[in-house]
From Swiss-Prot:
Pfam families per the UniProt record, alphabetical: FtsX, FtsX_ECD
Domain of life of the source: Bacteria
Organism annotation: Streptococcus pneumoniae (strain ATCC BAA-255 / R6)
Summary of the function given for this chain in its UniProt record: Part of the ABC transporter FtsEX involved in asymmetric cellular division facilitating the initiation of sporulation. Required in maintaining normal growth and cellular morphology.
UniProt record similarity statement: Belongs to the ABC-4 integral membrane protein family. FtsX subfamily.
Disulfide bonding pattern of the chain: none
InterPro entries linked to this entry: ABC3_permease_C, FtsX, FtsX_ECD
Protein name: Cell division protein FtsX
Membrane topology: Multi-pass membrane protein
Length: 308
């Protein structure tokens, strides 16, 4: 059994070397296909991740007027510290909504710190009294469909300056995620089929060039599995070689994209899939798909042209 495997392995490697240019063409087609598959997969998985993050973090930002101290129990008035009669009026109005999951206060100082982390030191000119930001309440909804209702009700609360719900952008992202999932997977499947077809043509030429040898093997009683073995291994090798370059690109490029794009997402409580998780899984998937494509292409040729 082991000796047969190594015999098939030797025949497959010898055939790849003998049909050098066709091997290069087949490997190149697999490489291009898997690169495109990796791109589509990266977009699909990360779009789905962002959509999930939004669904799990559906929120409305309610900005409080600058003349309202809703989160302080006392205020300074005419040089004296007095009780704040407006304490938590906005907070209580938001908290009492049946569609609200939680309400969290975010001071303008906290927002300023987050903004400088994202935008850089250019915003430091607004530090202290020059801070143009507003105190705000971060309101999490029970469900995505509740966002618009919460936003409309929050606008009616006295002391509220502005309300941001990101409704239109959120809906567009959900629609985009759905579109990419359906069409992205469809295009990836089409690319895999095309690569398998190209490999099948490469294997077919090999089969034709060795047709006399194959006929003799069949006449002397060689089993179908014995004849089929070297060709399946040859296809698998083509797929394996074609997966190397896309895997290297995934490892390098995804790391660069993650470091540059994820910074702008963190401030919105969103994130891409971590390279430590995504890259190993994607690389393993590319090698599996590569071997599958190669074996499938070889199998198609054997079935169509040898009638085995």
């Amino acid at each position: 059994m082991i000796s047969r495997f190594f015999r098939h392995l030797f025949e497959a490697l010898k055939s790849l070397k003998r049909n050098g240019w066709m091997t290069v063409a087949a490997v190149s087609s697999v490489m291009i296909t898997l690169t495109l598959v990796a791109i589509f997969a990266s977009v699909i998985f990360n779009t789905a991740k962002l959509a999930t993050d939004i669904e799990n973090n559906v929120r409305v930002v309610v900005y409080i007027r600058k003349d309202v101290e809703d989160n302080s129990q006392t205020i300074e008035k005419e040089g004296q510290t007095v009780t704040n009669n407006d304490y938590h009026k906005v907070y209580d109005s938001l908290k009492n909504m049946s569609t609200v999951k939680s309400v969290t206060f975010s001071s303008k100082e906290e927002q300023y710190e987050k903004l400088t982390e994202i935008m850089g030191d250019n915003w430091k000119i607004f530090e202290g009294d020059a801070n143009p930001l507003y105190d705000a309440y971060i309101v999490e909804a029970n469900a995505p469909n509740d966002v618009k209702t919460i936003a409309e009700d929050a606008k009616k609360i006295e002391g509220v300056s502005e309300v941001q719900d990101g409704g239109a952008n959120t809906e567009r992202l959900f629609k985009l995620a759905s579109f990419i999932r359906v069409w992205g997977l469809g295009i990836a499947a089409l690319l895999i089929f095309i690569a398998a077809f190209l490999i099948s043509n490469t294997i077919r030429i090999t089969i034709i060039s060795r047709s006399r040898e194959i006929q003799i093997m069949r006449l002397v009683g060689a089993k179908n599995s014995y004849i089929r073995g070297p060709f399946l291994l040859e296809g698998a090798f083509i797929g394996l070689l074609g997966a190397i370059a896309p895997s290297v690109l995934v490892f390098i490029v995804y790391q660069i994209v993650y470091q540059s794009v994820n910074k702008s997402l963190v401030g919105q409580n969103l994130s891409m899939i971590s390279p430590d998780l995504f890259s190993p899984l994607m690389i393993a998937l590319l090698f599996v798909i590569g071997v599958f494509i190669g074996s499938l292409g070889s199998g198609i040729s054997m079935r169509r042209f040898l009638k085995i």
